Amino acid sequence: MAEINRMQYEREYTEGISQSMRVPEKLKVAPSNSGVDPKTQPDMPIPGVFMEVPERIVIAGHSEESLFSRPSNLDFIPGANIAALALKTPPRVLTLSERPLDFLDLEGPAPATPHSKEVRSSGHLKRDGLASENSLRQNGQLVRHDSMPILRCGSSTSVPVTHHDNPRSAMSTLDTTLDSTPDDLALADAASLRRQIIKLNRRLLLLEEENKERVKHEMTMYSIIIIFGLLNSWLWFRR
C-alpha cells in the first residue's frame, strides 16, 4: 500500500512540474541596459550572438557562371599538358648488358662550361695542395736541414737567408690554394664515387661472365663423366 502511494505521489509531482515549468524567451548574458525595457524600444536591436550556417560554399570567380556551378578541380595544375603527365609502365626485367652503367664515359663528352672548368681546376689544385702539404709535413726535418747554412773550413761565407723563406712561401701558396668552397669538395667526391661505381660495375660484369663460363665447363664435365660411366656399365654387362 505504501508503495502504491509513493508511485502516485511521484506521478503527481512530475505532472505538476511539467505543467508549471516554462521555457524563457531569452537568456541575459550581461547586465548591460538592465534598466531599459526592450518592449518600450522595439527599434533597438537586442545584443546577442547569431550564428548562420551557409547552404553551400562557392569558390571566388565561379559565382557568375551559374547558380550551382561545379567547383573547379583543385588537383589539376593549370597550364600543364595532360599528354606529358602520362605514366609509362616500367620494364619487367632490368639488365645492364644492353646499356652498362659506364655509358656516360662511352658517350661524347659534355660541353664544359667556364664554371665547371673553374671547379675542376680548383679541385685539382686542392688535391695537389693537400699532397704537397702532406709531403712537406713528412719531410719537414729534411727541408729544415737543407735550408740551414753550410759552413766550410777556412771560409766565413754562408748560404743566403732567402732559403729560410722557401718553406714559408710554399705554405702560403698552399693556404691560398686550399681556400675554396665545400661545393668543390662535394663535386670532387661525387666524381670519385662515380669512378668507383663504374669500376665496381665492370668487375661485377667480369665476375658474371666468369661464373657463366664456369657453369658451362661444369655441365660439360658432368655430361662427359655420365656418358663415360654409362659406356663402362654397358661394356661390363656385355662381357
From Swiss-Prot:
One matching Pfam family: Miff
One cellular-component annotation, GO: peroxisome
Recorded superkingdom: Eukaryota
Region annotated Disordered, chain positions: 107-139
Molecular function per GO: protein homodimerization activity
Bilayer disposition of the protein: Single-pass type IV membrane protein
Bilayer-spanning residue ranges: 220-237
Keywords: Coiled coil, Membrane, Mitochondrion, Mitochondrion outer membrane, Peroxisome, Transmembrane, Transmembrane helix
Regions annotated as coiled coil: 184-214
Bias kind Basic and acidic residues: ranges: 115-130
Localization, UniProt: Mitochondrion outer membrane; Peroxisome
Keyword Mitochondrion among record annotations: yes
Any Gene Ontology biological process: protein targeting to mitochondrion
Keyword Transit peptide assigned: no
Residue intervals on the Cytoplasmic side: 1-219
Disulfide linkage: none
Function statement: Plays a role in mitochondrial and peroxisomal fission. Promotes the recruitment and association of the fission mediator dynamin-related protein 1 (DNM1L) to the mitochondrial surface.
Similarity-based family: Belongs to the Tango11 family.
Protein name: Mitochondrial fission factor homolog B
Gene name of the encoded protein: mff-b
